[in-house]
Amino acid sequence: MEADWDELSRIPVPAPSSHGLPTIATTIAFDDVSELLWAGNEFGRITSFYGPELQRYTSVRAHPVSDGPVRQILFHERGVISLSPKSVHMITRRGLSQWHIAHEEMTDLHCMSFTAQLNRIIVAGCQSAMFTIDIDKGVIVDKLQTDHNYTMMKKSRYLCAATDTGSVNALSLSDFQVVKSWKAHGTAINDMDARNDLLVTCGFSVRHLGSPIVDPLANVYDLKTLSPLPPIPFHAGAAYVRMHPKLHTTSFVASQTGQLQVVDLMNPNAINLRQANVSFMLGIDISPSGEALAINDAECAIHLWGSPSKVHFNEMSKEVEFADVVPRPPSLDWSPDTPLNMIGMPYYHERLFSAWPSHLVFEVGNPPASIDQSLIPYLRPAEMGHYAPNPKKTRRYQVENTRALTTAESALIAPKFLSEKAREQTRAKSEGSVSDTAEALAGAKLNGEAEDDPLLKYSNVEIKYSRFGVDDFDFRFYNQTIFSGLETHIANSFTNALLQLLKFIPLVRNLALHHAASTCIYETCLLCEMGYLFDMLEKANGQNCQATNLLKAFSSYREASNLGLLEENLTTKSLSSAIQSVNRFFLNQIAHDFRMILPSSDDLDHRLATIASESIRCMFCQNEIVRPGNSLANELIYPAIDIKQARRNPAFKFSNILRASIERETQNRGWCNYCRRYQQVTIRKTVHRMPLVLILNAALNNPLCRRLWSIPGWLPEEIGIVVEGGQVMCYEGDELKAQVQNKVPNLVLYDLVGLVAEIDIPEHQKAHLVSFINVSISSRETESKSRWHLFNDFLVTEVDKDEALRFNQPWKIPCVLAYQARDARHGVDDAWKDTLDTTLLFRDWSLNGGRPVESRQTLTEEEKPTPGTPVALDTEFVDLEKAEIDVKADGSQEIVRPNKSGLARVSVLRGSGIHEGVPFIDDYITIKEPIVDYVTQYSGIKPGDLDPRTSQHNLVPLKVAYKKLWLLLNLGCIFVGHGLASDFRKINIQVPKNQTVDTQYLYFHPGKNRRLSLRYLAWAVFKEYIQEESTDANQGHDSVEDARMALRLWKKFQEYEDAGIVNQILEEIFREGSRLGFRPPPRNGVATVLSRPGTAVTMQNNSGRNTPSTPDVGGAAAAAATTSAPATPRQAFRRSIALTPSNGTFGGPGTGDFFGGSPLK
């Protein structure tokens, strides 16, 4: 080991899956052919890393998880051989599988080694048999019986094999007979290495107390004379050893605590010491060149040691194959400022079309009518094209005016913006009665005019954006209830209706919230995201919400994309079939996520799974096999329909169709193992137990089946199911009442919770999904009366039960149904709030192994938040998508879709106690989506800060950062900040108003039409400069500084409250602000580089703290534009929290009468 040897690289061992946690490396080895370092983990995966930077090269699942960890890796010119307890696997260095060997007597393999024949290896373990394998053919060529349990093998002059009793056997390379045996250590051998004529071992022995400890000696043996040599002393405990590949008598000896010693076996006094920065070492390996040393430790990391001046794994390595670099197309300088004459024009001899006069342009015909998407499932092939039954949505000989449809607007006109209503309010005071009448008529239109007409409340709803953003949109026009709707303009928001249905099933809601409160931190856990969403919908109390985080997790699943469940894949797929496929995917993923945390619990199966078995019988040989047939979602299977007898034939009742669908019996062609050929087989399902929640897919793929649903009262609101002797009996209506009166045993009553339906109104062209839900079932108050509500994205309104369960309209198609056992009615369980797992708040969590900043101190158990604990919050965001703006012919602009932001940094500070103002959360969030703008001027985030490979900050996934805030919210903390409404919306979390203190509203003057920025308030109150703008593009805001300033402003406001001088302070602040333009004066008389003052709220307001003023429209307008703000700062303070006044920790120096210090001093 040369003098400049040091740690060159440190990388975490990759997680076994995309949403798993890092795991330890069970074995590491340097490739003797290429510049690669290989590592195996406990899940059967082997991964290679290239070069001194340990760049990830390949990763392969070589062994099933059930086979156990990877225990050894060997290298051959043709590939890499790995060994697990039950199998041996060979791959190429690019990751292609060559062969896989498993044998019934391979029960506990531990080691392998090359034999005298270079194309053969021998594998052994703690079992009675050893196997010889031909590498070229990938087959077992010989099986040898042995009386020893071998744990390690090294090939040299002999095949040195270590046993589990602490002995070492020298085996002959020809017949593998024991030539010599030594008792090397008392209990077990931990590591050994053999090279040339020397063998060195490290192991454990039993001392006085009876527990094995590491021997302080490394034993040395001469393989030429088969005799022991003097041992090498190593007082730290010799746990691992490797012989130098070039210096024949030099070896590396290491302890479990990371002490490294390079010693000459022939001269033990010549030693070289190093200390590796590890907590507990698990293994070492040295490269064939002797220039690099690899260490794996218990903290799931791999360390590479060597000389910075020269590091090569091999003397002569083969070139590593990499993927070909895709050539980029030539760059074209194209921008809005590029003149068209730079492109050039071809030579022409005739007049161009663009020069034709207008009187020569004619309309040659209307565009063809688009194919009705509801017809797609019913298409049948013909000699030319396809045909389908006529849906009869138009009258005979009636055609569509397709040219008018392309420009037709939605029948449901969006309401006026809040700012527009505020401006008109003062002008319309004298015409109040007229306005009231208009509003009443608008409400009447929303509820429709006739029973057979498509009601306006079923129309598509779209969010309109003004220059004041989404807060200016009047959501209360669409929702006057206490139940919150979900916003659109989010990818895959077509699932909103299904999410609402799942939320109102009490047992599913309880399952999701209890899981979210557990230890789960898997990044793409849908069950956790459902718990967060359901909690947010309950806390919103009628305010609009969005399922951004859940839908982002849903979009990240490769299975969802492969199955065509994402929005971009729905162009040729009907919404009804898509939502039923999404329903199956959600339920299967919920079950998977639940078992990740509670693998042995059957709580989910009891709630959601139909426990059944499937018997498959061959019709030819009568051979029958039985396999599990559990299902989470059942599809309705309809018999051959005779619509004339549908009303009288009991077989067409919903209950009988449901029974036949649950215990279905079908015939099909399948493979028979007994006949060894495809035969006609019968598949029959036997049900053993029904779930408490019965979720059904309507599966309406036939127009005739659609007529069943049009029968009034065909869908029952309650059903009864009895499972007895493997048979299912289902009842409804009068039959059910008779069964209840007779007190039939094992009868389970189910109530219809709700359903998802597709709305396809031809006049609006665009089909969408809504849900009808009986909200009384999930009510906390016991009530027997049904209360049905329509959830059409963010439009929520109460409807009659008959309207919800009526399907005689051709544009209303049922998709998903949900029944729940009546015993679970009103079963809303909030016990999860008492079992919150708060471990995440008290320990550091890092994705990139980054060291926590010195200014951050993690919470201690003594500082556990309690209800009323104040914390200061500030966040930073980056732009993922720019706003979509429609420029009209008159030059005006309309925001079609706002810019999409991603959470980049979260800082939370203590709001009280001896460490008041000290952050305990300061996390940067890794973002996998493309970032179009880091907005460094406002966020302080620079390129590379959110990349795990280059970031110097503490990086965490969005799930971890979100869960920390969610835990603080449900622990009852009070969030203090500036512009919190914007932050909470972008974080996608709902915080009740009694848990927020927003300094933007504390320092709001009722008579002024302006909200002050945090930057100006810091100067006005404390005479301090923050968020200073600079010409340096890499300088930006600091969220810790902003959160601390908001906390100080709140503490100072409390002092003003106690002194009773709030109004005087606000008057002085606004008077001084008017003189200065509501921005701090230049520092030391030198003007700083400032952008234009914020005099109007714009959609590009990237910082929630520099909030410009509301429009100058008078007091009524201001009140409407700030509907979420309290009437006065005193009311805001009293409504937020009442704490003791500041102890002066944050008191500024102060030079004026009202600014800079406490007025009480």
UniProtKB/Swiss-Prot annotation:
SMART domains, sorted: EXOIII
Catalytic activity: Exonucleolytic cleavage of poly(A) to 5'-AMP
EC number: 3.1.13.4
Residues at which a divalent metal cation binds: 874, 876, 983, 1042
Protein keywords: Cytoplasm, Exonuclease, Hydrolase, Metal-binding, mRNA processing, Nuclease, Repeat, WD repeat
Cofactor binding, note field: Binds 2 metal cations per subunit in the catalytic exonuclease domain.
Placement of WD repeats on the sequence: 20-59, 102-145, 276-315
Subcellular location: Cytoplasm
Classification via InterPro entries: Exonuclease_RNaseT/DNA_pol3, PAN2, PAN2-PAN3_catalytic_subunit, PAN2_N, PAN2_UCH_dom, Papain-like_cys_pep_sf, RNaseH-like_sf, RNaseH_sf
Gene3D superfamilies: Cysteine proteinases, Ribonuclease H-like superfamily/Ribonuclease H, YVTN repeat-like/Quinoprotein amine dehydrogenase
Broad class of the protein's primary localization: cytoplasm
Highest taxon of source: Eukaryota
GO cellular component, one term: PAN complex
Activity control, per UniProt: Positively regulated by the regulatory subunit pan3.
Domain (Exonuclease) ranges: 871-1049
Biased composition (Polar residues): 1097-1110
Biased composition, class Low complexity, residue ranges: 1116-1129
GO biological process: mRNA processing; nuclear-transcribed mRNA poly(A) tail shortening
Molecular function GO labels: metal ion binding; nucleic acid binding; poly(A)-specific ribonuclease activity
SUPFAM superfamilies for this protein: Cysteine proteinases, Ribonuclease H-like, WD40 repeat-like
Family stated for the protein in its record: Belongs to the peptidase C19 family. PAN2 subfamily.
Purpose: Catalytic subunit of the poly(A)-nuclease (PAN) deadenylation complex, one of two cytoplasmic mRNA deadenylases involved in mRNA turnover. PAN specifically shortens poly(A) tails of RNA and the activity is stimulated by poly(A)-binding protein pab1. PAN deadenylation is followed by rapid degradation of the shortened mRNA tails by the CCR4-NOT complex. Deadenylated mRNAs are then degraded by two alternative mechanisms, namely exosome-mediated 3'-5' exonucleolytic degradation, or deadenylation-dependent mRNA decaping and subsequent 5'-3' exonucleolytic degradation by xrn1.
Subunit structure: Forms a heterotrimer with an asymmetric homodimer of the regulatory subunit pan3 to form the poly(A)-nuclease (PAN) deadenylation complex.
Domain comment in the entry: Contains a pseudo-UCH domain. This ubiquitin C-terminal hydrolase (UCH)-like or ubiquitin specific protease (USP)-like domain is predicted to be catalytically inactive because it lacks the active site catalytic triad characteristic of thiol proteases, with residues at the equivalent structural positions that are incompatible with catalysis, and it cannot bind ubiquitin. It functions as a structural scaffold for intra- and intermolecular interactions in the complex.
Official protein name in the record: PAN2-PAN3 deadenylation complex catalytic subunit pan2
Lineage: Eukaryota, Fungi, Dikarya, Ascomycota, Pezizomycotina
